[in-house]
């Protein structure tokens, strides 16, 4: 299993707050997502993944779901293309979904985002 490069991770208070305030929100079956197209394009898409403690009290389950979300994105990131988008994935289901279900949801979200642009 490969890692997501540090350049593709959304980090920093100003970048995250800009995404949350100016970004467009959407919902999918088990995911809530927010995205923001950067202008001018910087050439790299960045993501952030969050699993609320309210749904999963144990850190082990939260970390498992975050790993699954990151891996699902990493294997399908070419669906976005080189469009320079910041994306937040917020896991919004109360049950632990298997990797294939998460991968399908991430694929549908990425297709929605790329079609809107």
Q: What are these model-predicted stretches?
A:
Residues 1-117:
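Positively charged, solvent-exposed patches that mediate nucleic-acid binding
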């Amino acid at each position: 299993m490969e890692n997501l490069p540090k350049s593709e991770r959304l980090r920093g208070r100003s970048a995250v707050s800009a995404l949350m305030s100016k970004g467009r929100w959407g919902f999918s079956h088990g995911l809530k997502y927010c995205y923001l197209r950067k202008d001018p394009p910087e050439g790299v898409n960045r993501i952030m993944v969050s699993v609320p403690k309210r749904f999963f009290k144990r850190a082990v389950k939260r970390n498992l779901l975050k790993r699954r979300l990151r891996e699902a994105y990493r294997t399908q990131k070419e669906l976005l293309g080189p469009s320079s988008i910041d994306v937040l994935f917020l896991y919004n289901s109360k049950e632990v979904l298997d990797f294939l279900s998460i991968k399908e949801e991430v694929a549908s979200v990425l297709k929605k985002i790329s079609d809107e642009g």
